[in-house]
Structures are given as C-alpha cells and as structure tokens.
Amino acid sequence: MVAGQVWHTPTQLFSPHYGRALARYLVTEYKLHLFPYHELVMYELGGGAGTLAKDILDYIADEEPDVYTCTRYRIVEISERLAHQQKERLARHVECGAVEILHRDFLQWNEDVNDPCFVIALEVLDNLAHDVVRYSTDDLQPYQGLVSIDHTGDFAELWEPVQDPLIKRYLKLLSNVRPSVLPPGAPVYLSWLPRWLQRWLAEYMPFYPNLTAPHYLPTGALQMMDVLRQHFPLHRLVISDFSSLPDTIPGVNAPVVQTRHKGEMIPVTTYLVLQGFFDIFFPTDFIVLRDVYLRLMGTTPEDGFAAVEPDAGVDKEYTTPASPAAYFTPTYPRAFDNPAVHVASYEDYSRAPDSLFSASDIVPPPLLNETHEARIMSHAEFLARYAEVQGTQLRDGSNPMVSWYANACWLLT
C-alpha cells in the first residue's frame, strides 16, 4: 500500500453520531421483534479500527442498559493486526463480555449460527472479489477473463468460455432475476440483427468487435450470501456501500482504480496494475443485489442456484423454506399477555404492548411491513430517520453527515 494513503469512511468522519444512528436502528428492530426472549446478537464483517463497534456498544451501554446486558457483538476480522487493534479499543466491552473478536475469513465460515442475528457489512462489498466476463457478439455466450503475467511482469487479458462454477451460478441467478434479450453491456443493435448477420459481421467485417464491453460480476458477494444461507438461517442483513463511483474504468459495474501521487488521487483506466500500489473499489447495484439475495434465500436444491455444501447428502437432512419469508419469520405469535407461551425463533412484536418499552423510548415504526422484504434506502434517508442529526448540524443549517455520501445506499432485510 502506498505510504500515507488513507481512506475515510462515514463511520470515522462522523463518529460517534454515525454509529449511534445504526445502534438506534438495531435496538429499535430488536425491541420490536426479539426483546425480551432473545439476545441482541450482531456480527460485523471487517471491523476496521473498531470505531463502529465502539460507537454502537457505547450507545447501547449508556442509553439502553437493559439491552446491553443481553448484547453479543462479534467482529469477524481477517486481519490479525486489526483484530488486535479492535481488542484494545473495545477493552471496556470485552471485559463486560459484550464483544468477541473472531480472527477468521467470513467467506470460509463453516459453523451453524441458529440464533436470530444481525449481520452488519459497511463498506465491505466494494472490496470483495469480482470476476469479469464479456459476451460474444456472435452468439452472446459469456467468456471469462483471465490475467496472464509474462516473464517481464507485464499483464495481459485472456478470454475463454466460462468454466468457473461460481461465475456460471451467478450468471444463472442474474438471468433468473433479470431476464433479458441481451446481456449487460451488449450493444442494442444485437437485439434486432438476425443471427446469421451477427455471425457474418463477426467473421468478415474488419474491426468489428467480437466481444462486448466487460461486465464485472460480484462473485465475492455471492460467496458471502452462500455463507449466510448455509450457516445463518435467521439472519438479518445491514449493508451499506456505494451505489455509484466517479472515474470508473470502462465496463458494466466497473471499478475505480486509483492511487495517490504527491498527495493527489490519480485514477487509471485499467485494473491491470501493480499489486499493492493501487486501490480498487467496486460500486454495488443494490437493486440487483436485493433480487439476487432474495432469490438465493428462497431457492431449493433443484433450482441449481445455491452452492453445494461439502457434506450435502451425507447424514444431513436438507430442509428449505417454501419462500424467502421463512428465512426471517416462521410464525407470529400474538399472545403477548402470557410469557409462558413458547415463542418462535423470529417474532414480530410490532404490536407489542407498551410494557416492553420504557416511557422515554422513541421507537420509529418498523421499516419492513413484511419480513421477507428487503428495503433499499438512500444514505440520507436512513440517517434522517435514525440519526441524532443535531449533533452534526452546522451553523448555516447544513448537515454534512446527511448530505455527504449521496452515492451510498443501505440494504436492510
């Protein structure tokens, strides 16, 4: 990494207000749906310096002491250095048993977590691995991209028919949720040109492109969703990331590739750059992400959309919900007046009695009317609803925490 290259996230810039806004959302949803029968369990993917975790836990400890006693915050961190830094920063909450640092790769997770939990991933998707494909202008078949490095260290792209099972599965999911005559990035004229003419142009026309523009696939995000589906059956997602980015390289869902030189950010036009000296950020198509997520969560083995578990079919009975809703809410009991009644795994307490809330609680109505929904919110919309905006308001009335990062969105399930 280039010396002095620092990236500031809203969590860092607006600490503690940004983390407190997320904490208010989490506590609100917890009180409406789980309190007091379950613990508040949270998994944060990639905790960075521990700023978000500290701000969330400080808020709960100071403002919601009853909730804090049953809070379990787990950070899944792949970096040993950051895991050590998080443990030092969160020492107060570690001593109280409210936080646990798990030094591991979430994409390699292999343990079942059957508790209702929130999975938090802020500024994670933009750094996850992507694959790139291009489509033949002859028959629209996809070709996967490979990078070759010669003896001098120069990079070159190679294209071959798609063989990677992860790419195949993502393309199958994408075509299911976004059926289209043309693949992403294909020129519009291919939709009305006869097939014989397409082949003739590809074979005989000088300078006619034989491949479409690159299409970057979020296969790393698909791997993350596989883990959630296989091992976190009662999770709720809290994702925030960039929906668009400036200065991207050519292609569909293409990233920004940039480095710092003499204190100035320099974007480049290719991802074929020297490793360790450039940062690569991918935008997230939140609408496609939501649809792929819901389709994957409601899939069956016969669909061929889900990843095959290593022990699938070996002394393990496979059960799948009939619809995505079953991943979030099996049943909704209404007998609140009888605490002895057995309560299902993920309850709906949106009609809970006032006794569940203290007199000082100001609890917004639930974001999701139906638990199988996945809601996309703008950065400003989420903060206007849950943030204590007076803490970041300037003298002229503007509020940078709300107005900045206009190219960011939230996905909440």
Language model regions located:
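Rossmann-like AdoMet
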Residues: M1-Y43, A49-C117, V133, I287, ...
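Long, Lys/Arg- and hydrophobic-enriched amphipathic alpha-helices
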Residues: H8-L13, P183-T413
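Beta-strand elements within well-structured catalytic alpha/beta cores of enzymes
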Residues: L22, V119, L237-I239
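Short, well-ordered beta-to-alpha junction loops that form the rim of enzyme active sites
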Residues: G47, V124, S240-S243
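Short catalytic/ligand-binding loop motif for oxyanion handling, primarily in non-cytosolic enzymes
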Residues: T51-A53, L82, N127-A129, P246-I249
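A short, conserved alpha-helix within the catalytic core of class I
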Residues: R104, W109-E111, D126-Y143, L193-L201, ...
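A mobile, often basic/glycine-rich helix-loop segment
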Residues: F118-P194, V257-K262
